[in-house]
Amino acid sequence: MAKEGPRIIVKMESTAGTGFYYTTTKNRRNTQAKLELRKYDPVAKKHVVFKEKKV
């Protein structure tokens, strides 16, 4: 069974189109908007924006 609570697992997918993604958790109560983070994409070999997608 899934864990109950405010934290959910989200997939952060690269906007560079490489298909690379990170997984992280976010608190649904504090952060209701979709996440956008600038992280390193090892396939593109540079920092790009990662956007939240459904797992």
Curated annotation (Swiss-Prot):
The keyword Ribosomal protein applies. GO terms for molecular function: structural constituent of ribosome. PROSITE patterns: RIBOSOMAL_L33. InterPro entries: Ribosomal_bL33 (IPR001705), Ribosomal_bL33_CS (IPR018264), Ribosomal_bL33_sf (IPR038584), Ribosomal_zn-bd (IPR011332). It comes from the Bacteria. GO terms for biological process: translation. Disulfide bonds: none annotated. Keywords: Ribonucleoprotein, Ribosomal protein. One of its GO terms (cellular component) is cytosolic large ribosomal subunit. Belongs to the bacterial ribosomal protein bL33 family. NCBIfam families: PRK00595.1 (NF001860), rpmG_bact (TIGR01023). This is Large ribosomal subunit protein bL33. It comes from Deinococcus geothermalis (strain DSM 11300 / CIP 105573 / AG-3a).
